[in-house]
Regions:
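Active-site mouth loops of central-metabolism enzymes
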Residues: 47-63, 135-150, 218-237
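N-terminal amphipathic alpha-helix/helix-capping segment at the start of soluble metabolic enzymes
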Residues: 2-39, 44-46, 216, 224
């Protein structure tokens, strides 16, 4: 037995040609790893570029179907859908999120009916639906956790019933993953996958997304710091991850 040291160990042996390098590569990125966001706008036809996301557009549902076909033809097999609803449907509790056959649910059904092979990820959060732009129910200036979870659970069930393959709670309420998983199991959505935003930071990087779903104006100068994480805390992110049970 010899020790792993030069000259018995020559790591350059593994780099002598491109095929060998490919054979032992640790990280490979392909179109199978990509997820294309689709922003679908209610009562809208055509496309509308999102100024803070160059090259990304708000789409009417018919245009979204065309976009999904183009995405599949390009070799990307997964999409994440986000709703842009009419402002007059927004209220303080995001009630439109749990209405049967709401806009995003009907859009998901249309996409899955036409493209059953696409992996469709649906966002679970209330900020596209609330008139204050927060991800939960407000009591005064405070987002209340447990009452928000009740709505998120119903929203998740609605999206699963519409045909979403994966449910992605992005709200950062404590305990929502366990509650949603339990409800999905109870309602026989056992194969629906949960993709949790387990560690979501209160970051300016979310600004373009809020522009995309038209929630930025509703949020105004209000902060999401009471539920999204402080950007300075990495250990807290690990703690959040340890609390996820799905």
């Amino acid at each position: 037995m010899f020790k792993r040291k030069y000259p018995n160990t020559r790591l350059r042996r593994l780099r002598k040609n491109s095929n060998l390098i490919d054979l032992i590569s640790e990280t490979n990125i392909s179109s199978n790893d990509l997820i294309q966001p689709i922003f679908i706008k209610e009562n809208f036809k055509g496309t509308e570029e999102i100024n803070s996301m160059p090259g990304i557009f708000r789409l009417g549902v018919d245009q979204a179907l065309i976009e999904v076909e183009n995405i599949l033809n390009a070799g990307v097999n997964s999409i994440a859908v986000f709703p842009i609803i009419d402002n007059d449907k927004k209220d303080s509790v995001g009630s439109e999120a749990i209405k049967q056959d709401n806009f995003i649910s009907s859009s998901i059904k249309k996409i899955k009916d036409r493209f059953p092979e696409i992996v469709l990820i649906a966002d679970v959060a209330l900020d596209p639906y609330t008139d204050h732009g927060h991800d939960g129910i407000l009591e005064g200036n405070k987002v209340i956790n447990d009452e928000t979870i009740d709505i998120l659970v119903n929203q998740a069930l609605l999206l699963a019933d519409a045909g979403a393959d994966m449910i992605a709670p992005s709200d950062m309420m404590d305990g929502r993953i366990g509650a949603i998983r339990k409800a999905l199991e109870k309602e026989n959505f056992k194969d629906t996958i949960l993709l949790s935003y387990a560690a979501k930071y209160n970051s300016k990087f979310y600004g373009p997304f809020r522009d995309a779903v038209n929630s930025a104006a509703n949020l105004g100068k209000s902060s999401k710091s009471s539920y999204q994480m402080d950007v300075r805390n990495k250990n807290e992110a690990i703690q959040e991850l340890s609390l996820i049970h799905i």
